[in-house]
Amino acid sequence: MTFSADYFVKKTKDMLLSMPIPLYTSYGSMTVNSGTVKNEGIEFEASYRFKVGEVNLGINGNASYVKNTVTDQGPDRVGLNNIGGGMGGQVSWRENGRPYGFFYGYLHDGIFQNQQEIDNYTYVDSNGKTHLIQPNAKPGDIRFKDLDGKNGLNGDDRTMIGNPNPDLTMGLSLNASWKAIDFSITTYGAFGQQILKCYRDISSTPLNNYTAEIFQRWHGEGTSDKFPRLSSASSSNSVSYTHL
């Protein structure tokens, strides 16, 4: 039987990044080398080989914990892929101190069950006047958290809502051999990451397939505090923690 443990720090520099440039150049962006990402963690590996009669058997397993962080971005925040099409713009970002490709959006704070909850969700401006935080909301829409407490809901209220990078990865392999015959099986697992479920942004087109989650959508007061009402207006239920 063998066992090993390793601590590692890997820094990746000068990654490719598409950066916006002035329009007078006739180009919208250019690819540059920018940014540094640090992967730090620990890895364990163990193996055991034995024999049963004429059959040789082996078990190998490994597990690793990794923390991924952007350490030298350059610009404060750069959008990466526009995942999900019309789900509120770019939701995969790169920023100093955050994991690479983190999901960026509004924090889900439940569902408006009735008009009174919408009317009670307010802020007071510098002149002492009260305003609705989500004036266009309807019962059944997502209530987004007003993080900065200023001027209602705006781009400054978006934050990191998920990490696509797994915290823990594991692998296990089993193998057996007898004379000229051998057999092996390998499994792999990743845990702790979030997945952006774009399919939850259900549109009104009849060509789309729906999952059983459609039956959990809000369809009246008290029916759901997680999934919003069905709506063809994607802006009313923009990307948020609900999509993770």
Regions picked out by a protein language model, each given a short descriptive name:
Residues 1-9, 42-50, 57-65, 170-176, ...:
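Membrane-embedded beta-strands that build the outer-membrane beta-barrel scaffold
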Residues 4, 8-52, 141, 157-161:
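Outer membrane beta-barrel strand-and-loop segments of large Gram-negative receptors
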Residues 16-20, 71-76, 196-202:
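Outer-membrane beta-barrel translocator domains and adjoining extracellular loop/strand segments
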Residues 19-29, 148-155, 234-239:
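Flexible, solvent-exposed coil segments and beta strand-coil junctions
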Residues 22-30, 81-91, 147-149, 204-217:
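Surface-exposed loop/turn segments flanking beta-strands in extracellular/periplasmic regions
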Residues 32, 51-162, 226-227:
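Conserved small-residue
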Residues 38-42, 55, 166-170, 244:
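Residues that define the transmembrane beta-barrel architecture of outer-membrane proteins
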Residues 190-244:
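Extracytoplasmic gating/loop element in the C-terminal half of outer-membrane beta-barrel translocons
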